[in-house]
Regions:
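Charged, alpha-helix-forming regions
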Residues: 1-7, 16-136, 140-229
Length: 229
């Protein structure tokens, strides 16, 4: 199921998004997280918050964020929600689940999901039963609360993030602007990362080896990519 980010985000948004007591990426990551969730009845409030936050962000981060906001405000919640489903639920190349790019729908992805969930739990953070821990909106939300700890998680999946960004641009999806904004908060791609992006683009994510059973508990094994989460 697509995260809707309504249970936790309102309680933890105000200080982070205003920049109080946080390092620079935290306010950006918080609003990027909210805007990468499914557009629902809270969208108008999120857009207003994001406008205020964008005014205080560096231009490379703020400019693409404003481009997304312009589109969302023109489009409205219902049409944007329909676009969201078309882009993220029906197009494998636009998968928002970061471990998919590194591991595909293999047993290794289940192990990676379990590791991420344990990382969250060690920090006292809990997911709902409907949320997978590697959805970009979820990763960004938690990164906003622990910027240094979770920057590593984002950079570990830098190649997948870049491939998602490129795929969104290829399809003309407005969320490409949000990925531009996210990328502007991270270090530039290194040579190895560029090679990984090129390899992923050419070959796609890994496929499961025949005859090997999953090593993670069944509850942490994702459904195949391509449907609502």
């Amino acid at each position: 199921m697509t995260p809707r980010m309504t249970d936790r985000a309102p309680d933890r948004t105000s200080d982070r998004a205003s920049g109080q007591g946080t390092s620079l990426p935290a306010p950006a990551w918080q609003v990027q997280s909210l805007l990468l969730a499914y557009p629902d009845e809270h969208l108008d409030g999120r857009l207003r918050l994001a406008r205020r936050v964008a005014a205080a962000l560096p231009e490379p981060v703020a400019a693409p964020l404003r481009r997304f906001l312009d589109h969302a405000e023109r489009t409205g919640t219902a049409r944007l929600a329909a676009e969201y489903v078309e882009v993220f639920d029906h197009r494998r190349r636009c998968c928002p689940f970061l471990t998919y790019y590194a591991h595909g729908d293999t047993r290794k992805r289940g192990v990676a999901l379990l590791r991420i969930k344990r990382t969250y739990a060690a920090a006292g953070l809990r997911l709902t039963d409907e949320e997978l821990p590697d959805h970009l909106a979820v990763v960004l939300e938690f990164a906003a609360g622990e910027p240094e700890a979770y920057r590593k998680l984002l950079t570990e999946h830098r190649a997948g993030l870049e491939l998602l960004r490129l795929a969104l641009h290829d399809t003309g999806a407005p969320w490409a602007h949000l990925l531009d904004s996210v990328s502007a908060t991270l270090p530039p791609l290194g040579g190895d990362e560029r090679e990984a992006v090129a390899r992923l683009a050419a070959e796609g994510p890994p496929e499961e080896e025949v005859g090997l059973a999953p090593f993670a508990p069944p509850q942490y094994m994702p459904d195949p990519v391509g449907g609502r989460r």
